[in-house]
């Protein structure tokens, strides 16, 4: 950085003062899609010289507005508030950011920032998809279902009737297989996400599988009247032709190519209070994302029956 004088201050490169703290609060702390939110950020100049030409940006998912603060003297703080509205179709992770840009002398610009995020309910199961677990036999590297570059074969699935968007019935329950191409997101890793539901029925059923051992965890169904129903799942590992499987595929992909050992998909679920309208589902928290060697539960489809 260069040195110079601005507003009678001298910038010295050996002074470590280019990270003034900025704080950010979001209200309400757990907003809903389509609701109003207020972002409040405070930039405090802890440097021994003034911050020049200071601009403070407040943003939601990277989109926001700047506020010009001008010169911020040493020891002074400036607060700006922005009231905005989340999109009606907002879902999943929503990030909030406060980002300050400033100069401390000619040619000596710097910045500081802080971020936070909230996880909104997903509007549908496909909206929650965060893993690509299906690959074509001629393009194995586009998917990874277990953190070790393994995947289900699109061709083996098609031979079993599981083509994109297909309606398939197991144990009297009909599911819609993900309408996605190999390599695209096609399943959700169960990590405690919330998915909105509607309607009513006697059973909430899932079609999925587990990698690196049995996928075990606790979930929750929330009804429209505010009542809750806890449930537990224990889904066997995908490797092998399991007697309890709804679908058995003759082979899978691994990092080095085709592996001619069978893998299994399963149906599982929870019995519901059929007289109640559904509001949402909290998926079982089995893992924190995809990790090789860690039991992970994947859901490809669900239905209220």
Q: Positions of the model-derived regions?
A:
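Asparagine-centered strand-capping/turn motif at beta-strand->loop junctions
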Residues: 43-50
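Short, hydrophobic beta-strand segments
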Residues: 80-89, 98, 268-273
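N-terminal/edge-of-domain interface segments
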Residues: 14, 111-305
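Low-complexity, acidic Ser/Thr/Pro/Gly-rich terminal tails and inter-domain linkers that flank the onset
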Residues: 11-32
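Terminal connector regions
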Residues: 1-15, 88-120
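Short, solvent-exposed loop/linker segments at the N-terminal edge
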Residues: 29-36, 50
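Structural beta-strand segments of beta-rich domains
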Residues: 35-39, 202
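Intrinsically disordered, low-complexity Pro/Gly/Ser/Thr-rich segments with frequent PxxP/GP/PP motifs
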Residues: 63-89
């Amino acid at each position: 950085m260069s040195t110079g004088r601005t507003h009678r201050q001298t910038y010295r490169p050996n002074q470590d003062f280019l990270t003034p703290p900025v704080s950010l609060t979001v209200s309400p702390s757990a907003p809903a899609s389509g609701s109003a939110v207020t972002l409040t950020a405070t930039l405090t100049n802890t440097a021994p010289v003034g911050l020049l030409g200071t601009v403070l940006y407040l943003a939601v998912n990277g989109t926001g507005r700047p506020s010009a603060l001008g010169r911020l003297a040493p020891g002074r703080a400036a607060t700006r508030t922005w009231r905005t509205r989340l999109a009606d179709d907002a879902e999943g992770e929503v990030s909030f950011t406060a980002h300050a840009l400033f100069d401390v002398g000619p040619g000596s610009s710097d910045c500081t920032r802080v971020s936070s995020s909230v996880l909104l309910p997903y509007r549908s199961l496909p909206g929650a998809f965060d893993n690509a677990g299906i690959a074509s036999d001629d393009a194995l590297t586009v998917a990874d279902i277990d953190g070790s570059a393994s995947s289900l074969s699109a061709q083996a699935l098609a031979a079993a009737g599981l083509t994109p968007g297909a309606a398939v019935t197991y144990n009297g329950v009909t599911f819609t297989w993900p309408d996605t191409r190999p390599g695209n997101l096609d399943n959700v890793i169960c990590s405690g996400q919330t998915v909105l539901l509607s309607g009513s029925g006697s059973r909430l059923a899932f079609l999925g599988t587990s990698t690196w051992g049995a996928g075990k965890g606790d979930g929750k169904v929330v009804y429209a009247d505010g009542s809750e129903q806890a449930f537990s799942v224990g889904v066997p590992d995908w490797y092998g032709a399991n007697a309890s499987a709804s679908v058995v595929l003759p082979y899978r992909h691994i990092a080095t190519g085709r592996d001619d050992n069978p893998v299994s998909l399963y149906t599982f679920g929870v019995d519901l209070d059929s007289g109640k309208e559904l509001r949402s589902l909290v998926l079982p928290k089995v893992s924190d994302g995809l990790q090789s060697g860690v039991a992970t539960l994947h859901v490809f489809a669900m239905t209220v029956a």
